[in-house]
A protein has these predicted regions:
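Nucleotide-activated sugar donor-binding and catalytic core shared by glycosyltransferases
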Residues: 1-234
Length: 234
């Protein structure tokens, strides 16, 4: 899908209620600014390192499926055209509706890895409001750098390690996150470095389940031994 789309993709992953409206306002503002620049024929766009609207695609994947319709309505209230994943017969590049849309809405289940693989950078849902964030290791494993907000307490250690390794960047809020993402999309060298850092971070953090089981094995063996003794004495 990524090669067929042939445009950078900015993803808002596992977005939450209270975050989407601000995201759409930022995307709408970027689109309006780009149209204004084109209308007055200025060179401001060429002087900016950020990718302007019309040269990237915005993908949003809400955390809760029951909110797909509400999220689409929020986007449309900002004058943004929406194309839903469920309406694509194949990939987005084969859908005229998708390629003309301002927002792609990931309204499917079990395809998060596909969405991350399609995207060049992801905003971490749940981190721009006091909701604790989401697990960002899946994004890293797909080679997708992350921009996150201040609220990552549910995954504090992973977020700190990702930030320290260059796989993620932390910003104050959604306006800063969108700008940081667009700047990354406009800087090929920085993007290559971020992708490499993401893959390396994911590789270092694979096998967490195996590590946990190894750590618990002595305890589990002790429990099994006690059960055998209790059964023998019964």
């Amino acid at each position: 899908w990524r090669q067929a789309v042939a445009q950078p993709v900015l993803m808002f992953a596992s977005s939450r209620d209270g975050e989407e409206d601000e995201f759409f306002k930022e995307i709408s503002a970027v689109a309006k600014a780009a149209r204004a620049q084109a209308a007055i024929n200025t060179v401001a766009e060429s002087q900016s390192e950020a990718v302007p609207a019309g040269r990237f695609k915005a993908l949003i994947v809400p955390r809760h499926p029951q909110r797909f319709g509400d999220v689409q309505a929020l986007a449309e209230q900002q004058g943004l055209r929406v194309s839903r994943r469920s309406a694509w017969a194949a990939g987005p590049a084969e859908s005229m509706d998708a390629m003309q849309a301002d927002i792609w809405l990931g309204d499917s289940l079990g395809e998060m890895a596909l969405y991350y693989g399609l995207s060049d950078v992801a905003l971490l849902g749940g981190s721009f409001a006091p909701l604790g964030g989401q697990n960002l290791i899946e994004a890293a494993a797909c080679g997708c750098p992350v921009v996150m907000g201040l609220h990552t307490y549910n995954f504090a250690e992973a977020a700190e390690l990702a930030e320290a390794s260059g796989a993620a960047r932390r910003v104050a809020g959604l306006p800063q996150a969108v700008q940081a993402a667009l700047l990354l999309l406009g800087d090929t060298q920085a993007q290559v470095s971020a992708v490499s850092a993401s893959l390396a971070f994911a590789a270092r953090n694979r096998g967490a389940t195996a590590h946990t089981l190894n750590a618990l094995r002595p305890f589990l063996q002790g429990v099994a031994a006690k059960s055998q003794v209790a059964a023998a004495l019964a």
